[in-house]
């Protein structure tokens, strides 16, 4: 099997699985319980939170555990909207966002919120002048992802933050799902940040919203005690402990991993440039993600042709549906490219042998499936 869909999800690290199983067996108490077993679980959660905080350079009190990035994005957006709608009903975002950002914003329009989409340059980076222009006295939130999940565009979060911070009362949220575990991120540049552990070889079903300590938002889940007043529900002790382990492992030898992935990326791009395709990723894309468009073949047809050869890549993102990519359309203004896009996502587990096999099969499929 050749797995080239690491941005959709990653296989779980064996050490992470071992941690999860051990905690399931040895820590049976509800961390909200006052007896010894409950206190043991709570102590483990506190230790795990401190470990996560140390790795990310934040305070453990700033962590709100969620079921994943989608819930964290919803909590950030809906929590701010509910708390601060009296101050204003204007939110700014981009067309590059994950559906778990765009859909809650669309939902808020039903309640009178105005959503503005900042312009992008030809590389897919935020136009800072347009962002400045869009911010008004009614703006309460800007939500812009650190790394786009489809074509991997890395936004200049520091410059974006400077523009936003010139306006008192405007909060900055960033979906950092595609960069955590792959590159460093400065959490002090944003008020809130969302991520999912399944993207860095952790378990599915656990993620977090990192929220500035003194920022108050409304919860979207009510009833039931948890680690924070901002998200109800019994804390998932095994998932939290395994998340801490996965995050620590993800940042071990990060520079070495980044160097290896850069070499693989360049090797893959060189091979792809020789095929009858259009590459959508560019110099501002993270090295883990390579997006390209087929010229005369439907992406779904190619997806299943590759699957027959035990090769797995994506069309658009795993959490989105639709006939074309809004991300690529917003950058290229080319419906054909947006309708025929495919995403390869690699990791430090990917090998050159796998890439060679993928290129060999892709090349053969392009010749065989042309005009389908």
Language model segments and positions:
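Pyridoxal 5′-phosphate
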Residues: 1-372
């Amino acid at each position: 099997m050749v797995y080239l869909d690491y941005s959709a999800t990653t296989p779980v690290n064996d050490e992470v699985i071992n941690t999860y199983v051990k905690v399931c067996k040895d820590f049976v108490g509800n961390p909200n319980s006052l007896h010894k077993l409950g206190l043991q679980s709570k102590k483990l959660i506190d230790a795990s939170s401190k470990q996560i905080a140390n790795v990310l350079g934040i305070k453990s009190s700033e962590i709100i555990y969620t079921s994943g990035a989608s819930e964290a994005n919803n909590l950030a957006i809906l929590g701010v909207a509910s708390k601060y709608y009296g101050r204003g009903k204007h939110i700014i975002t981009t067309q590059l966002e994950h559906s778990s950002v765009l859909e809650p914003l669309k939902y808020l329009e039903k309640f009178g919120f105005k959503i503005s989409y900042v312009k992008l340059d030809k590389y897919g980076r935020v136009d800072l002048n347009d962002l400045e222009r869009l911010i008004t006295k009614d703006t309460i939130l800007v939500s812009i992802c650190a790394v786009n999940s489809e074509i991997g565009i890395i936004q200049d979060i520091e410059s974006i933050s400077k523009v936003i911070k010139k306006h008192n009362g405007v909060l900055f949220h960033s979906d950092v799902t595609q960069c955590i575990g792959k590159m460093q991120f400065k959490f002090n540049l944003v008020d809130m940040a969302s991520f999912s552990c399944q993207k860095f070889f952790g378990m599915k079903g656990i993620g977090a919203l990192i929220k500035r300590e003194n920022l108050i938002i409304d919860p979207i889940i009510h009833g039931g005690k948890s680690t924070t007043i901002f998200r109800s529900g019994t804390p998932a002790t095994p998932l939290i402990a395994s998340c801490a382990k996965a995050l620590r492992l993800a940042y071990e030898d990060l520079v070495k991993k980044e160097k290896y992935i850069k070499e693989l990326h360049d090797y893959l791009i060189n091979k792809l440039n020789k095929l009858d395709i259009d590459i959508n990723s560019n110099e501002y894309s993270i090295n883990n993600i390579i997006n390209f468009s087929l010229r005369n073949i439907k992406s779904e047809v190619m997806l299943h042709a590759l699957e027959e050869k035990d090769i797995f890549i994506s069309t658009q993102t795993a959490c989105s549906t639709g006939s074309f990519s809004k991300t690529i359309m917003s950058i290229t203004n080319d419906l054909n490219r947006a309708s025929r896009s495919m995403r390869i996502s690699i990791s430090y587990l990917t090998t050159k042998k796998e890439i060679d096999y993928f290129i060999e099969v892709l090349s053969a499929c392009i010749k065989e499936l042309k005009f389908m």
